[in-house]
Amino acid sequence: LSRDEGERLLAFCNNAGPGFLLGVCGAGLFSSSRAGAALYLIHVAAALCAGLLTCRALPPVPHGTYPHKSAKAQHLSAAFPAAVQNALTGCLNVSAFVVFFTVLARLLLHFLPEAFASSLPCALLLGFLELTSGVLSLPCSRAGFLACAALLGWGGMSVHCQTLSVLAASPLSARYYLKGKALQALLSLLLALPALPFLFP
């Protein structure tokens, strides 16, 4: 892949896993495996549509051959400790952003009126910052389902910061990333509308 192709893939390839969609959202929030399966299909379809629309809107990538960099062989005694250290760094990176945005969300709740803290707009605000906090604050209703689909498409600022921290150590930029996630959130909302009569009759 070229650098430009990698940056275009970033616009739609960073998505929630099926375990979160089926378990936390479907079974946990809506108490329905059908709702979880619907959210999963909506999530995947919105990502693919966002990718197609993004690539269609951008100029074509010039075809050509790219130099192949062969990986330097490492001895097991050096590769194994490095792998463990890199895994720990990745876990700490994820945990740090999750904790930061969760605390930030709770601080916001502390200063907001109590009536707003239990409302759908508040859940959307929490989900904009940190996905899990927002999803778990949603009501089990049609509006909650639509909001859940949109938040899953967006991903949350916590996830975006995790992605940007990884990109900082690579030659890739995030020029298409946030636009792609915003588009995916909108498409997720639109794709969730036809599912409402079947899930919430």
PLM region spans:
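Alpha-helical transmembrane segments
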Residues: 35-51
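Generic transmembrane alpha-helix signature in multi-pass membrane proteins
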Residues: 10-11, 19-29, 132-140, 161-168
